[in-house]
UniProtKB/Swiss-Prot annotation:
Catalytic activity: DNA(n) + a 2'-deoxyribonucleoside 5'-triphosphate = DNA(n+1) + diphosphate; Exonucleolytic cleavage in the 3'- to 5'-direction to yield nucleoside 5'-phosphates
The keyword Thylakoid appears for this protein: no
Gene Ontology biological process terms in this record: DNA catabolic process; DNA-templated DNA replication
Pfam families for the chain: PolC_DP2_cat, PolC_DP2_central, PolC_DP2_N
Gene for this chain: polC
MF (Gene Ontology): DNA binding; DNA-directed DNA polymerase activity; single-stranded DNA 3'-5' DNA exonuclease activity
Lineage of the species this protein comes from: Archaea, Methanobacteriati, Thermoplasmatota, Thermoplasmata, Thermoplasmatales
Species annotation: Thermoplasma acidophilum (strain ATCC 25905 / DSM 1728 / JCM 9062 / NBRC 15155 / AMRC-C165)
Matches recorded under InterPro entries: PolC_DP2, PolC_DP2_cat_dom, PolC_DP2_central_dom, PolC_DP2_N
Enzyme Commission number(s) from the entry: 2.7.7.7, 3.1.11.1
Name of the featured protein: DNA polymerase II large subunit
Keywords assigned by UniProt, alphabetized: DNA replication, DNA-binding, DNA-directed DNA polymerase, Exonuclease, Hydrolase, Multifunctional enzyme, Nuclease, Nucleotidyltransferase, Transferase
Amino acid sequence: MIMSQKPFDLEGYRKYITEKVREAFNVAQEARAKGLDVSDHVEIPLASDMAERIEALIGIKGIAQEIRDLSSRMSREEVSLEMSRRIAAMFKDNRKEALDKAIRVGLAILTEGILVAPLEGIADVYIGKNQDGSEYVGISYAGPIRGAGGTAQALSVLIGDVVRRELGISRFQPTEDEIERYIEEIESYDRIKHLQYMPTPDEIKLVVRNSPICIDGEGSEEEEVSGHRDMERIKTNRIRGGMCLVLCEGLVQKARKILKYTSSMHLDDWNFLANLGGKAEGKSSKKSDKFLKDIVAGRPVFSHPSRPGGFRLRYGRSRVSGLAAASLNPATMYIMGKFIAIGSQIKVELPGKAAAVTPCDTIDGPTVLLKNGDHVKINDIEKAREVYDDVVEITDAGEILIAYGDFLENNYPLPTPSFTVEWWEQYLPDGVNAKDIDQFSAVEISRKYGIPLHPYYDYYWHDISFEDLEFLVKNAEQWSITEDGMRVPYPAFDVFIRLGIEFRRSGDYLIIRDYYPLLISLGYDVRNGKIVNVKKYERKGSVMETVNYLSGLIIKPRAPTRVGSRLGRPEKAGDRKMKPMVHSLFPVESYGEARRSIIGANKNSEGSYKAEVFFYRCNSCGFETPTPVCPRCGGHCSPLGEKTGSIDLESILNRAESILGISLDSLKEFKGVKKLMSKEKVAEPIEKGILRAVHDISVNKDGTCRFDMSDIPITHFRYREIGIDERTLADLGYEVRDVNELFPQDVIIPRKAAKYLFNVSRFIDDLLVKYYNMPPFYSLESEEDLIGHLIIGLAPHTSGGVVGRIIGFSDVNAFYAHPFFHAAKRRNCDGDEDSVMLLMDGFLNFSARYLPSTRGGLMDAPLVLSVLINPDEIDKEALNVDTLSRYPVLFYEAAERHASPAEIEDTMMTMKVRIKKTGTYMGSSYTMDTSDINSGVLVSSYKTLGTMDEKINEQLGLAKKLRAVDADDVAARVISTHFLPDMYGNFRKFFSQEFRCTKCNAKYRRIPLSGRCQKCGSTSLTLTIHKGSVVKYLNETLKIAENYRLPDYLKARIDNLARTIKETFPDTEEEEKPEPREVKITGLDMY
């Protein structure tokens, strides 16, 4: 796939991608045309832009050009509403169809034709009757509407209203009972699922009473409402999750945004929205502990909200941050118990809810206190490894680098900035050397030019009290200057820790090497080797003001904003396996037993069994079979349809062995599925499953092979760090230089992914050669040969894939790609994960006919493929990524007054502004370099620690080390949000559980009176919830309660539960991992 050539420009790159996609498509089309698959054509339509994606997704021919024409002069939202009007007019003879098509097209435009929400998020659109006999429009929402996001959810209701008006249908008139039902239902849903924003009862009443459209939904939850049941116009008593999402996270939470559109379109019926959403959309710069909600055992807290010693906010963007990802020094990752790895998700206090972690070794690492009493800063990972076992306390977590664009995206007021070198350098007059600044020149430059003191010699004065400051001022004259530095008596220890001053412990003294700026800040100087007072102490308005007064210098706050955080999900990079692992989408019913073995099914059924499957009839011999080619005579078959019939598995397997030249005896395992979940019950050609078993790869629900990874961004790369040489770099169309800007569809995959995709490529080649009788497509000799080949990226909640090109490999367990690539998949980098597949695998093996017919079955399937990325058609978050090489002083001044980030967007040159001003998104930069994108912890210790006991010990042990963490609070939260709910829940379920047959997996609410499985006759029936599941956290809970200071009410809950469990299960001992215990049952012996 690699070709030697001149460097690409953007147009040449896009042309190259298009040609390679078409080349692969044509090969797959030739293979499919042979009639050996469930369809005779490639089932992933190619789309060059959003308009084509929408046309392919919704299936209305000819609308793509209309969408393009409107998009050239209207905003996305305006296009959505206008196209909805046009679609309604197109189908005006059938009002229900007009409503349905118009709303789905409008929603598809809002979601860029990528999400499945327009297909599955709207369960139904209907016309109902009001009590006065007039008609109204109802939209029934389903769970997948969540993926559309709040704004699109709300606008879909608005679209319904616009179309309703066009069709002359009246507005919805709810009854008081119906309004009360909405309130009860939403409150219940929030208790079960936790809404992002929970409206007040008055807000719910306001929306339901005034919305011209009935916001309805299908019953999505098992729980039913207790009151307001069996209502005429609400068809279910179950909680309607889709309705709750649209009303709360859509209309109420996004009320201000929706008002902009209703006002411009003079839709006065929606003016009531002005009374909503005030609390929902406002962001506050005050500290918040929301990120501490639902702490999980084993996943540590790194800092409580805004607490001294926590992560210090540093503004800027590394080449691997932005789009919600934040960067940490690799040393920080290591010192934090190795819990934070590259790609790990951390829940954060600001500006959003979470961030994926990437490395940046040009920002500050942590400051730690060692066993020998030394207080040192650790800025490189090698030093972190060296001192790791000697760390007594982590007094400062180091810096967290968060990009301006993330504050802009979240509309979060800019918090007070830390004073940093890149800010300080902009105060420096031209001609003054900014390098090699020592403690004496730092003070001299500040005095001479009237600029702030260099941040390296600035301390956390804002973290100490007046009493602390006065203690230092009072005792400074007793300190002494030596050859090693300044000797300070030990009592200053605590204050120095809070100030972040590095020192070396020597007996009863602390030795400070860079002492001069400290003395100056306290109103002292050094004369003839002696410390002398030069400014009389006088208390000012704050400690910072007093230090500025004493020093006579400008001293900026070093770290005024601290960011609380905890570990969310650990990083992920692994091949996707269905549970249990499956090689072939071929039904074995109960004959394959618990392991779903196809070979076992052949033996147990003696070669033939009945199954519900799509059948074909041979055109030559008339034999009926679930395969498109006759297993008896090899003739082509015609489709019959779905039915319950007899599968001649032995003939099918014999023919497959003959065609492929593979003996089934050589396979370690060969697994199918118990039943087919698709609408038509179409089975996959079994030859594909055999070849997957040979290459040890698993099939996904849609016939493809996937590799799942956490998403992290990258805009610039060094060729050496991605495992390629200069020749390969040039062959890929890049200039040979140290750092290159990444083309938007180029990706860097983990080496684990390379190994898996290499195996998939060999499977594809075998499939082409042995099954389709065609030449191989890949012919790879090693994993490195994957470079230059194309993949499809696909996010779980979407239905549109994006083409990418592999240009290298990383050592991390995450997926490096351009922000535009992630955004084209409707993903950001706050801990999201998604998958890739080889392009030819998708073309050759995907079929929509394999997809489950259940709600959400169309999600995570490449129903359409975007060949090229257009910045105008991707999620707008990627356009908020900033591109400057240095943030200007204007930015820092805006942050000092907590300005809205939108005020300075033009100055900050976001991708959006860059495209507007220059016509291209290429040529971007970053503020902080990273020497190697692989530098840092590669696997979180959360994944390497064995038992839960070990994880909790490490979690709480780290909490004790961190100055910014309250270990007692962490212990209490772990128990109250994880252990107790788990034990209470399993205790209740234990007494209302099902029983399971270990042979065929059949489940029973009660044990059959015969004591045998009614499906297979086995007597091996077992519990589904074991005693060990109930008591597994009990001992750990009691241990924590004994060693940490917990609230009295929590101790009482623990004591009550422990007593109940021990009375129910005498002689209880903790069972961390209970093994399923087979229960042999005969008759009523169980009782």
